[in-house]
A protein has these predicted regions:
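Polybasic, proline/glycine-rich intrinsically disordered low-complexity segments
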Residues: 220-330
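Enzymatic toxin/effector payload domains
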Residues: 174, 215, 254
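Short, flexible coil/linker segments at or flanking structured domains
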Residues: 140-142, 158-160, 203-205, 245, ...
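Surface-exposed beta-strand edges and flanking loops
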Residues: 111, 120, 174, 219-221, ...
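A contiguous, surface-oriented mixed alpha/beta subdomain in the mid-to-C-terminal portion of proteins
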Residues: 171, 180-249
């Protein structure tokens, strides 16, 4: 028989949905909407902030600095870039064309995500450009500062498996930007030493700290060596660089360090959401369904369980999907 995990069930004590699914209270924050459909989106955001990111109502008080006009901070990005232990990442693609140029040939290569034009010296295998249509391996920049808004993104020095298969996420709760630089460098160094296949991102806006997902690591293939290495590298900083709490939707590995599996929602049109957004959306759906059913307070968990099952989430362990294999839980 399905039920909600104790941690999530306990957290729901700060949530109330009423007024026919048009008003909700999450912690000390009230959100309203003209319809249950509109409320679901706003409630999803509030649950994401309260239960996953840990920002509560978020933002600065009246005496705090004004909102930034950009999510990028050049000084912080330079520090984050300096902490990356490798310069390039291998990417495999199909050669489309060789373009002779006076200053050196260029290659047009069709990668999984896009078709790019690069200098021929980016070719790492084979040694010389083959005929168009052949597969080649390029050495591209590992650091990609503007790829994910508000985050500094990096690819590991080892190729990712294709197809990707299940992806394990690690979340690190950095207290501030200085702590994030320290934790970022330590995590990447541990991942490289462990031979992990991964990519990762870290908050690049100093005003957005602290967050429970300040650093996010995406582990491919056998996640366990990389996961153990990151935990071992970061545990010595518990209580100083890391804040203790973690997302309600995740599995806590150590204070301020948590893990979960990428969503595997069986319904069409549900891809594209982050882990935290996916879990918060499912939770909001169940809470609003309960409000519309005029059910008893004790029925609320049953509605949330139903919404989680429809979204492919294990309601007892929301860090897992229903498709998570037993061996993946280790």
């Amino acid at each position: 028989m399905w039920g909600l995990g104790a941690r999530l069930a306990g957290a729901l004590g700060v949530v109330r949905v009423g007024d026919g699914g048009r008003e909700a209270v999450v912690g000390g924050r009230t959100v309203t909407a003209d319809s249950p459909r509109d409320l679901r989106g706003r409630l999803t955001n509030a649950l994401y902030e309260e239960f996953h990111a840990g920002r509560g109502q978020g933002g600065f008080g009246a005496d705090g600095p004004p909102p930034r006009r950009t999510l990028r901070d050049p000084a912080l990005e330079r520090r984050l870039a300096a902490a990356v232990p490798h310069a390039t990442t291998p990417v495999r693609g199909r050669l489309v064309e060789v373009l002779p140029r006076p200053g050196g040939d260029e290659l047009v290569v069709r990668l999984p995500e896009a078709t790019v034009r690069v200098r021929a010296d980016r070719l790492s295998a084979p040694a010389v450009p083959p005929a168009p249509g052949a597969y080649v391996e390029l050495a591209l920049e590992a650091a990609r500062p503007a790829l994910s808004p508000g985050f500094f993104y990096v690819m590991g020095s080892r190729p990712l498996p294709r197809p990707a298969g299940p992806v394990r996420r690690l979340f690190v709760h950095a207290r501030d930007a200085d702590a994030a630089v320290l934790l970022w460098g330590a995590a990447l160094g541990a991942l490289e030493a462990a031979g992990a296949s991964y990519h990762a991102k870290v908050l690049s806006d100093p005003q957005d700290f602290p967050r429970r997902d300040s650093v996010v690591v995406y582990l491919h293939g056998d996640h366990r060596p990389g996961e153990r290495a990151v935990v071992a590298a970061l545990v010595p900083h518990a209580g100083t660089a890391t804040a203790p709490d973690t997302s309600v939707f995740t599995e806590e590995l150590a204070p301020g360090i948590a893990a979960a599996w990428d969503p595997e929602d069986p319904r069409p049109g549900q891809d594209g959401m982050s882990f935290g957004q996916h879990r918060a959306f499912a939770l909001a759906s169940g809470l609003i369904a309960h409000a519309l059913a005029d059910g008893e307070p004790g029925d609320r968990d049953a509605h949330v369980v139903r919404a989680f099952l429809e979204a492919g989430i294990d309601p007892r362990h929301p860090q897992h999907n229903l498709t998570t294999r037993p061996g993946d839980r280790r």
